[in-house]
């Protein structure tokens, strides 16, 4: 499992992370991990019309890690992760006035990923039950960038409003950055 390359797709809400993750997985004929937070928070919203609270963050992070561990067992050379714990950390700090559980930071440093794609905000924001910050996407982009810089990880930024061009850009970056041997 340590030979499997882990690539994280991250960025603010409504930047095409889930679509990018699935498209990259299809392009590279590989497995992917869904965003645990989306399913968890959608269920919370559907059941009680409540949004994410500080108390949810550890469950979200642990759920994401568990999903990754399950999916990697059925993967060969490459796996794409629709967000990871660094996303939860950035979100926590931004939405809860700098608050984060120390476990999030320690795990974000402990867990190793081979490469990150940070999706920029230059695509149209699309509303849904869980998206609530159309005017904070640039702030969230910078929060994600801060976490990636702080972790000193290898990443590139995906830009542009055309989703096909963004996908081609991502494929090119991955081919240049990941050793497939």
Describe the role of every protein-language-model region.
Residues 13:
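The conserved Walker
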Residues 17:
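Conserved lysine of the Walker
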Residues 22, 26-65:
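Conserved substrate/cofactor phosphate-moiety recognition/catalytic segment
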Residues 48-97:
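Conserved nucleotide-sensing/catalytic segment adjacent to the nucleotide-binding pocket
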Residues 95-164, 172, 178:
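A glycine- and Lys/Arg-enriched "phosphate-lid" helix/loop adjacent to the NTP-binding pocket
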């Amino acid at each position: 499992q340590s030979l499997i390359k882990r690539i994280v797709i991250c960025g603010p809400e409504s930047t095409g992370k889930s679509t990018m993750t699935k498209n990259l997985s299809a392009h590279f004929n590989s497995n992917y991990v869904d965003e645990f937070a989306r399913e968890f928070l959608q269920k919370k919203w559907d059941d009680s019309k409540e949004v994410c609270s500080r108390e949810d963050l550890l469950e979200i992070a642990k759920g994401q890690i568990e999903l990754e561990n399950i999916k990697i067992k059925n993967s060969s050379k490459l796996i794409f992760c629709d967000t990871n714990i660094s996303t939860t950390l950035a979100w926590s700090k931004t939405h809860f006035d700098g608050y984060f559980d120390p476990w999030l930071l320690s795990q974000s440093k402990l867990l190793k990923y081979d490469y990150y794609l940070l999706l920029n905000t230059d695509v149209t924001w699309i509303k849904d039950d869980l998206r609530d910050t159309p005017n904070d996407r640039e702030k969230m982009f910078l929060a994600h960038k801060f976490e990636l810089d702080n972790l000193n990880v290898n990443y590139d930024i995906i830009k542009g409003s055309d989703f096909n061009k963004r996908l081609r850009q991502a494929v090119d970056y991955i081919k240049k950055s990941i050793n497939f041997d």
